[in-house]
Amino acid sequence: MWGYVHLISWVAIVVLTVTALAIYSKSTKGFTILQMINRIFYILVILSGVMMVQYSVEQSWILAIFKILMGIIVIGVVEMLLSYRKQQKPTGMFLMIFIIVVVITVSLGFYLSGGYPLFN
């Protein structure tokens, strides 16, 4: 069950982040609402990740620690990306880092879980 919560939360974070970036110029209030909803999903990701960490450590404790660090970095990059957007500063570098770090984190997550819950 925690695998599904984790996966859905990560997908929601990515979708909400991209949506917030896209609507900022049209609605700063909508942007702020999406940013707050994103933060709720951070809590779900952290909670579900803590519940699943024992399975990842069994697979490879080094990769599990690296994935935990990458997950924290993703959350930090999302926050920087959204705050730079709100301050109307250039976000290109953070967007590129966001894409790279998300791909690495998702790849590690599926490797450590053996593809669960997407590939049973």
From Swiss-Prot:
Segments forming a coiled coil: none
InterPro entries documented for this protein: UPF0344 (IPR010899)
Transmembrane segments: 3-23, 33-53, 62-82, 92-112
Localization terms from the record: Cell membrane
Membrane topology: Multi-pass membrane protein
One GO CC term on file: plasma membrane
Major subcellular site: membrane
Pfam families given in the database record: DUF1516
Keyword terms: Cell membrane, Membrane, Transmembrane, Transmembrane helix
Family from the record: Belongs to the UPF0344 family.
HAMAP family: UPF0344 (MF_01536)
Name of the featured protein: UPF0344 protein lwe2280
Gene source species: Listeria welshimeri serovar 6b (strain ATCC 35897 / DSM 20650 / CCUG 15529 / CIP 8149 / NCTC 11857 / SLCC 5334 / V8)
